Amino acid sequence: MQINSHLSRLVYDVAAKYGDREALIYKNFSGKEWKSCSWNQFSGIVKQVSNAMLALGVNVQENLGVFSQNSVQYLFTDFGAWGIRAVTIPFYATSSEQQIQFMVNDAKIRFLFVGEQEQFDKARRVFTTCRSLERIIVFDSAVQLPEGDSTVMSFTDFLKLGEGLTRQAEVEQRQQDATMDDIANILYTSGTTGDSKGVILSMGQFHAAVEANHKDVPVDENDRVMNFLPFTHIFERGWALLCISVGARLIVNTYPQEVQKSMREQHPTCMSSVPRFWEKVYHGVQERIETSGAV
C-alpha cells in the first residue's frame, strides 16, 4: 500500500509495487466490451498526460476543467495534472451551459476536458462567452470534431504531445517541489441557492482523509472496486484515492443507469454508494414481488 505517497506520485508508486497487475477495468464511451490496463500502463499514460500538459504550457497550480462522466481518461487527466502540480476542477456531466460558463470564468480555466458529444456541444456553445477558455480536449473518440479548428482537440491527439516523455525531467522537478499545501481540486457547489461556490481541497486534505479511512475501511489489493458515483462527487473521489492507494482494481462505471448491469458482469467486492441507490434497488425488488405470480 502507498498510503503515504503524495498525490503527484501516487500512481507511479503503486505501479512500482504492482507492475503488470490489473489496475483499471472499463468500457470506452458507448462501448460494449470491457477492457483493462495494468498499473504500469496506468502510470505510463499518466506520465504522458503530464508531459502533454507541459507541452501546452500548463502552469503550476493552474486550474483545468473536467466535464465528463466517469472514464479512465478522467483518471488519467486528474493524475496527470497532479503530476505537474496543476489543479483539476470537476464539473458534473449534466451541468447546464450557464453553470459551465460561470465555473470556467470564475476559475479562469484555459483548458477544458470533456467527455462525449453532449458535453462537447455544450462547451462549444459557451466557448465565446468564456474569456479565458483556449481549448477543448475531448475524451470520446466518437465525437465529430470540426476540421481546421485549433480550439478543439481529441484526447488521442493530446496524448501525442506527450509521446517520448521529453519533458519528464520537468515533471519530476515539479513533483520534488510539491507540498501538501498544493491545491488538488476545486469542487463547485450545486448553486441551487445562488451562484456556485468553489470549495478548495488541498493535497494534504486528501492525504489525511485516505490515511484516516485506511485505518477503518477494510479494502485491499485483492478487492474489485466499482466506481459508481461520479468522480465529481467528493465521496467517490476520496474512495477512489483510497482504493488506488492500496492497489485495488477499479471498475469504472461510466453511465449510472448501467450500474446494475456492470455489477452483474464484473462482480465487484465493494463500492461506495448513497442511500438513494439502495432505495431504488429495494423498490425494484418489491415491485417484482408484487407483480409476480404465486409460487
Residue locations for each model-derived region?
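Structural core segment of the AMP-binding/adenylate-forming
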Residues: L10, L56, G83-L161
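A short helix-loop-beta submotif of the ANL/AMP-binding
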Residues: S50, E62-N63, Q69-I89, A93-E97, ...
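Conserved pre-ATP/AMP-binding loop-to-beta segment of ANL
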Residues: G19-E22, I137-V138, M153-T156, E163-Y188, ...
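Conserved AMP-binding/adenylation subdomain of ANL enzymes
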Residues: H207-R224, F231-V295
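Conserved AMP-binding A3 loop
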Residues: S36-N40, A184-V210
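Conserved AMP-binding/adenylate-forming core of the ANL superfamily
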Residues: L24-F79, S96-Q101, S154-E163, M203-G204
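Conserved ATP-dependent adenylate/AMP-binding module captured primarily in the ANL superfamily
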Residues: N51, S95-T128, A209-M226, P256-C270
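Conserved structural elements of the adenylate-forming
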Residues: S43-Q48, M180, V199-D220, F228
